[in-house]
């Protein structure tokens, strides 16, 4: 029985095939704050020679203020509305690698656009690793609570069932960022190969007159 694990082929050898099979789609990284979407996304984009965008950075450019200031001044609902406009606009620049904010994929309209025009990749990290990482940036709006760890656990409970709708899930807490980026690329190539095989099998079945 053949393994479903992506083969460890050098990235340089699968790059051109991946870009051809990607067919003008976006690679969209989703997951909670602190999983490393931006850092890993930049590395993926560099290895594949694709443009990289961070939706939070693009939101700050559009609003001319920080995410923290946006939350404080206009509230979360206004931030989410701007987030949707920015991400849907960024998706027009395909192919690209896009790192999204933790709540973006929860938005149904964003989720539909990602599934229509991209491949969604959930970067998953355990709670302790997350808390260790987010503690380095104490200004995160959603963690301005008396018990940030409890808040993070609630976010996991709320968001994980929706994150699970992603095309791919990559557990990234045990690997360094470069290795995770390489794992993402290999998993995307494996996904595209499977997608192509499924199309070929479907086409063969449709043309079968036996």
UniProtKB/Swiss-Prot annotation:
Q: Which residues form a coiled coil?
A: none
User: Please, which domain of life does this record's source organism belong to?
Assistant: Bacteria
The annotation note on the cofactor reads: Binds 1 Mg(2+) ion per subunit.
- Name the pathway: Metabolic intermediate biosynthesis; chorismate biosynthesis; chorismate from D-erythrose 4-phosphate and phosphoenolpyruvate: step 5/7
A Pfam family this chain is assigned to: SKI
Q: Where does substrate bind?
A: 56, 80, 102, 159
Looking up InterPro entries in the UniProt record yields: P-loop_NTPase, Shikimate/glucono_kinase, Shikimate_kinase/TSH1
UniProt keyword list: Amino-acid biosynthesis, Aromatic amino acid biosynthesis, ATP-binding, Cytoplasm, Kinase, Magnesium, Metal-binding, Nucleotide-binding, Transferase
Compartment(s): Cytoplasm
Q: Name one GO biological process term.
A: chorismate biosynthetic process
Gene3D superfamilies for this protein: P-loop containing nucleotide triphosphate hydrolases
Major place of residence: cytoplasm
Name the catalysed reactions.
Answer: shikimate + ATP = 3-phosphoshikimate + ADP + H(+)
Q: Which family does it belong to?
A: Belongs to the shikimate kinase family.
The name on file for this protein is Shikimate kinase
Q: Which organism is it from?
A: Bartonella henselae (strain ATCC 49882 / DSM 28221 / CCUG 30454 / Houston 1)
């Amino acid at each position: 029985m053949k393994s479903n694990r992506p083969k460890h082929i050098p990235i340089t050898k699968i790059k051109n095939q991946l870009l051809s099979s990607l067919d003008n789609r976006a690679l969209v990284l989703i997951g909670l704050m602190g999983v490393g979407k931006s850092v890993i996304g930049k590395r993926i984009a560099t290895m594949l020679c694709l443009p990289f965008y961070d939706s939070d950075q693009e939101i700050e450019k559009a609003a001319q203020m920080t995410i923290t200031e946006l939350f404080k001044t206009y509230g979360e609902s206004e931030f989410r509305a701007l987030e949707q406009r920015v991400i849907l606009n960024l998706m027009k620049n395909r192919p690209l690698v896009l790192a999204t904010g933790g709540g973006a994929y929860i938005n149904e309209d964003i989720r539909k656009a990602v599934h229509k025009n991209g491949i969604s990749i959930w970067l998953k990290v355990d709670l302790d690793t997350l808390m260790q990482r987010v503690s380095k940036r104490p200004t995160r709006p959603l963690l301005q609570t008396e018990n940030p760890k409890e808040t993070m656990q609630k976010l996991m409970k709320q968001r994980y069932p929706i994150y699970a709708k992603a095309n791919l899930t990559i557990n990234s807490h045990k690997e360094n960022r470069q290795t995770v980026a390489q794992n993402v690329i290999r998993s995307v190539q494996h996904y595209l190969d499977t997608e192509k095989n499924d199309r070929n099998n479907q086409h063969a079945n449709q043309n079968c007159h036996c």
